[in-house]
């Protein structure tokens, strides 16, 4: 009888810990001032020769969490992003929909969540990426994600401007 009670307790404890782990993944700050965070990222990006990468989504969004897991756990992607971008996660939820701020970016939420934006060192939107094009099966296509980060980096944009005779 005691063994059954012990086993039942362990099973219930495991289930509870699993549920708690799922609830603690919070990559989006629902209280953040998106406009201030992006302005700070633009300033830092300008000083460091980078672009700004904005992830719009929420802690409620499984595809947002999957994307974050990919780019933070894949060492090559993590290094690529840190070397070329200032990253800002802009929350969209019932607690804080950031509607006014997202309007200044051209309503990127029209693509669903997550949606990604690349801003230049002056805060201008260079690219809005619908995440659907990066998805594969139940996750993301790593090569497509890497390609997006490579093609929209400040370095690549400067190289393109030099090669094709224009300026960014």
Describe the predicted segments one by one.
Residues 5-15:
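Sec-dependent N-terminal signal peptides
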Residues 15-21:
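Sec/Tat signal peptide C-region and signal peptidase I cleavage site
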Residues 21-28:
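Cleaved targeting-peptide boundary
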Residues 30-51:
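A short beta-strand-turn-helix
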Residues 32, 74-99:
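Thiol-based oxidoreductase modules, predominantly thioredoxin-like and allied folds used
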Residues 56-72:
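Conserved redox-active cysteine motifs that mediate thiol-disulfide chemistry
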Residues 93-113, 122:
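Structural alpha/beta surface segment adjacent to cysteine/selenocysteine redox centers
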Residues 110-164:
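Non-catalytic, surface beta->alpha helical segment in thiol-disulfide oxidoreductase systems
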């Amino acid at each position: 009888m005691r063994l059954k009670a012990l086993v039942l307790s362990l099973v219930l404890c495991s289930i509870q810990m699993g549920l708690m782990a799922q609830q603690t993944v919070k990559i989006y700050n629902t209280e953040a001032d998106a406009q201030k965070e992006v302005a700070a990222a633009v300033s830092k990006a300008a000083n460091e020769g980078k672009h700004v990468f904005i992830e719009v989504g929420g802690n409620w969004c499984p595809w947002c969490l999957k994307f974050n897991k990919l780019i933070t756990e894949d060492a090559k992607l993590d290094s690529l992003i840190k070397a070329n971008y200032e990253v800002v996660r802009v929350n969209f939820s019932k607690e804080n929909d950031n509607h006014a701020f997202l309007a200044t970016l051209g309503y990127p939420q029209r693509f669903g969540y997550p949606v990604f934006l690349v801003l230049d060192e002056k805060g201008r939107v260079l690219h809005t990426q619908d995440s659907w094009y990066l998805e594969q099966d139940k996750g993301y296509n790593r090569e497509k994600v890497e390609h997006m980060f490579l093609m929209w980096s400040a370095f690549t944009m400067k190289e393109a401007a030099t090669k094709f005779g224009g300026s960014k």
